[in-house]
Amino acid sequence: MELIVALGVIVFKVALVIAILLLLPLPLTWLERKIAGHMQQRMGPMRVGWHGLLQPVADGIKLLTKEDHIPAEADRFLFKLAPILALAPPFVVFAAIPFGESVSVLGNEITLYISNLNVALLFVFAVIGLEVYGVIFGGWAANSKYAVLGSLRTCAQMISYEIPMGFAVIGVVMLAQSMSLLDIVRAQTDVWNVVYQPIGFFVFFVAGLAEAQRIPFDLAEAEGDLGAGFHTEYSGIRFALFMVSEYVVMVLVSVLTVILFFGGWNGVLIPLPPLLWFLLKVAFFVYLFMWFRFTFPRYRYDQLMAIGWKVLLPLSLANIIISGVVFS
């Protein structure tokens, strides 16, 4: 009986996380448009619903009812598979993400995570790296020069940024002496890691912008020179899946930043519930992603490569050496 209850709890957690992640782009697209309107001294969406709150629903209905166009020369199987490959990895990663310790429900302790892996950090980097295959297959299968160029840029961008991103968290692992995300958060009960690892945080967050393919590092879908990059030929529900994937990765990078460098659900000064602290921190970094989009220009391709190899990689290596000397 206990086994059945435990399995039921796990299934409920998985279903809840999937439902939240699928619905999350709706409020985020509305928020991003409102932020854009505020920064450009206009009102943003106002027509559909009160202050445009139903605009994302209208956009979703529009995408679901549009023609699912497949180019005549495309590889149909890979073209259909690519959006799923882009969407699945960030969803799987959330299975190892803790949102808190536990809560009491009807006298039972319910943990706020699906799985507590001892090597959760390694699992996160291994799985999130698979997302790039969806982008590569989507661009190549479309048989379009703009889409292929977008895919090639994604390959180069991933190599340039995932290496320093991985190196940036080694200092955090040294401090916590564990690769478990729960242990990393518990190690920040008194002092957040960003105090000891400012260089690691800088490298991780900048590389995270590239990982999420957000401005100023959205070279794979640069509208000015590639139309829409790897998803130029996509429409309807398949295009929507790529958009959901982009927003989920943005939230994932924000969550990882909070867990690794900003104490997770550990608060300061103000006595708020741990889960609320966690959500407020994540919301701040999500807002920062959106603020960057309407503040910074897009880097050129050669500039993006130079930042990855000549700036972030040396900084991440220097951070490892400094951390090893200071915390050994």
UniProtKB/Swiss-Prot annotation:
State the top-level EC class: translocase
Protein EC:
7.1.1.-
Q: What keywords tag this UniProt record?
A: Cell inner membrane, Cell membrane, Membrane, NAD, Plasmid, Quinone, Translocase, Transmembrane, Transmembrane helix, Ubiquinone
Which GO MF terms does the UniProt record name? NADH dehydrogenase activity; oxidoreductase activity, acting on NAD(P)H, quinone or similar compound as acceptor; quinone binding
Q: Where are the membrane-spanning stretches?
A: 3-23, 77-97, 119-139, 165-185, 191-211, 250-270, 272-292, 307-327
Give the top-rank taxon of the lineage listed in the UniProt record for this protein.
Bacteria
Q: Which GO terms describe its biological process?
A: aerobic respiration
Q: Which GO terms describe its cellular component?
A: plasma membrane
Q: Where in the cell is it found?
A: Cell inner membrane
* PROSITE patterns (alphabetical): COMPLEX1_ND1_1 (PS00667)
Q: Which membrane topology describes this protein?
A: Multi-pass membrane protein
- Assembly and interaction partners: NDH-1 is composed of 14 different subunits. Subunits NuoA, H, J, K, L, M, N constitute the membrane sector of the complex.
Family, similarity comment: Belongs to the complex I subunit 1 family.
What is this protein's name? NADH-quinone oxidoreductase subunit H 2
Q: Which organism is it from?
A: Rhizobium meliloti (strain 1021)
Query: Lineage of the source organism?
Result: Bacteria, Pseudomonadati, Pseudomonadota, Alphaproteobacteria, Hyphomicrobiales
Gene name of the record: nuoH2
